[in-house]
Swiss-Prot record:
Segments on the Mitochondrial intermembrane face: 2-245
Protein name listed in UniProt: ATPase family AAA domain-containing protein 3
Organism superkingdom: Eukaryota
Keyword field contains Membrane: yes
Keywords of this entry: Acetylation, ATP-binding, Coiled coil, Membrane, Mitochondrion, Mitochondrion inner membrane, Mitochondrion nucleoid, Nucleotide-binding, Transmembrane, Transmembrane helix
Gene Ontology BP term (one): mitochondrion organization
Listed Gly residues bias regions: 27-38
CDD domains (alphabetical): RecA-like_ATAD3-like
Gene that encodes the chain: ATAD3
Membrane protein topology class: Single-pass membrane protein
SUPFAM superfamilies linked to this entry: P-loop containing nucleoside triphosphate hydrolases
Primary location recorded for the protein, binned into one broad class: mitochondrion
Induction text: Up-regulated by Angiotensin/AGT.
Subcellular location: Mitochondrion inner membrane; Mitochondrion matrix, Mitochondrion nucleoid
Amino acid sequence: MSWLFGIKGSKGEGTGPPLPLPPVQPGGEGSGDGGAGDRPGPKDKWSNFDPTGLERAAKAARELEHSRHAKEALSLAQMQEQTLQLEHQAKLKEYEAAVEQLKGDQIRVQAEERRKTLSEETRQHQARAQYQDKLARQRYEDQLKQQQLLNEENLRKQEESVQKQEALRRATVEREMELRHKNEMLRVEAEARARAKAERENADIIREQIRLKAAEHRQTILESIRTAGTLFGEGFRAFVTDWDKVTATVAGLTLLAVGIYSAKNATSVAGRYIEARLGKPSLVRETSRITVLEALRHPIQVSRRLLSKPQDALEGVVLSPSLEARVRDIAIATRNTKKNKSLYRNVLMYGPPGTGKTLFAKKLALHSGMDYAIMTGGDVAPMGRDGVTAMHKVFDWASTSRRGLLLFVDEADAFLRKRATEKISEDLRATLNAFLHRTGQHSSKFMLVLASNQPEQFDWAINDRIDEMVSFELPQREERERLVRMYFDKYVLKPATEGKQRLKLAQFDYGKKCSEIAQLTEGMSGREISQLAVAWQAMAYASEDGVLTEAMMDARVQDAIQQHRQKMQWLKAEGSQPPTLRTQAE
């Protein structure tokens, strides 16, 4: 069973007994040099070997060799050997396949490396080409710069050459002019010497010629005077001796003087008549009365005004219920007065600014079918001496109205002040007297309406001429809400829905917002609320998208409130009473 241990013996040779194993020595060898017995010596490599397994294997081999199944065991061993060889061959194939796969991976890696190398070479070539292109561009730019510098240098040299040539030409011209001037001076000097010499030589002849010319001129003048005197004398003698000519001449001159004087006065009278009938006085700022010039300029508007029907006196005017009832009674009474051709009553409207006095006066005139004219008291004082004439022209012009005229005097306290206590000029005093003279009696031609913020400054004679006094107070919360809604509809809603203007309105509760604004604007007048609505419209137009938002309205309301407070502070600083407190005191 040598094959069991991997040892090949000769053919037909048996296997002897197993080789004896060397005995195990538990201890060391004898003593040696250096006292070897004192320390342990090196152990043998077979000292820890257990031979039991080998003995069992040898025993099994002997039994197998003497057994009758030795051949089958040998065949089995050979088959196992073949199986091992096949397994080794399979492993070899796997190894070869692994080697081939490794070669394939190496080839793929080499291809990838080659691709990367080519890509890197391409990138390097591109970078080299870009760098070469950059160098070429820089070289081209340098060439252009050099060429530009060369051109500039050539241009500079050409300019210098032209300047030198111009300087040389200028010097040549100056030299030529200098020589010409010298020659001219020499010529003039020579001519002067020659002329002086000739005059010295011909002095007697020249004096004789001058004497003869003077005598001839004197003789001519004397003869002309003598001839003219003779002609005038004979003509006057003939005119005086003929009495018919004298009479006709005197009559003609008299008629000429009368004609010139008559034409001058007739022109003045006609001008005053035309001014009173057709023109507009200088004190009148605004009027609804139609003039010839206005009819020629705006015929369509004039025709619409003539065909328009009387309007409601309180249309567009927001007042408190009590005041509204009172002014409506005044409007009805005025309209009936015009229908019955009776005498008009004079009205005084007083109160803070912006409460609707002027607006109601216009509406009252339109409701009554009358014309209106507006003048301001501040225009009277600057006229000086012409104030009396201008005041008479206003009342003369008002008396010529066929429909009746409502004369509205705004800021009347500016010239209708107290004559006893106020310091007014003589011209203004005379104008006030003329006003009192023309308003001393009621008229069926015009109705006088005065408006003032300080009625206590009126002259007592003015108060005596007032038939009705109406106090316009600041709007309360209900009136303010009506005003806010009216002006919001006029300046915001209508332009946003009807017009073609660039105005849009954001979505929010308009009614609630108007109520909130009316609550916040306490103490404001109707004019201030109107200005607030106009400011909303302006903010919408000023925005980029043209949309009026709730925040924009709130911001403008806060600005208006702050401005109103500032105005009230200024009024208190001046020592005047604010309109709200003044109204409450009254």
